[in-house]
Amino acid sequence: MVNVPKTRRTYCKGKECRKHTQHKVTQYKAGKASLFAQGKRRYDRKQSGYGGQTKPVFHKKAKTTKKVVLRLECVVCKTKAQLALKRCKHFELGGDKKQKGQALQF
């Protein structure tokens, strides 16, 4: 279980800052895939009409987790940076700090 605080004081690469400032932390989420990307247009054109599935569908999945990516936004200049963490099954943002002698809860 990885628990990350919602704010973090870290280096800001922004032109105004270039020093350690407070950053707001959120979890990165991939955007919706565009229907107009060249690969998607080609794929849709190929799939249309008769003839079933035209490209191989990937089945041999090897990984059970994804790497967690944090999105850090500087509170001073609003510059955004991304920071990849290690793989983990349980990720929590701004959860309660653990106390001594207490059982883990999911």
Swiss-Prot record:
Recite the other comments. Confers resistance to cycloheximide, an inhibitor of polypeptide elongation.
Stored PROSITE patterns: RIBOSOMAL_L44E
A biological-process GO annotation? response to antibiotic
Please give one Gene Ontology molecular function term for this protein. Answer: structural constituent of ribosome
Which is an annotated Pfam family here? Answer: Ribosomal_L44
- Family affiliation: Belongs to the eukaryotic ribosomal protein eL42 family.
Q: Can you supply one Gene Ontology CC term for this chain's record? A: ribosome
Q: Is the Ribosomal protein keyword given for this protein?
A: yes
Instruction: Give the source lineage, highest ranks first.
Output: Eukaryota, Fungi, Dikarya, Ascomycota, Saccharomycotina
- The protein's name: Large ribosomal subunit protein eL42
Keywords of this protein's UniProt record, alphabetized?
A: Antibiotic resistance, Cycloheximide resistance, Ribonucleoprotein, Ribosomal protein
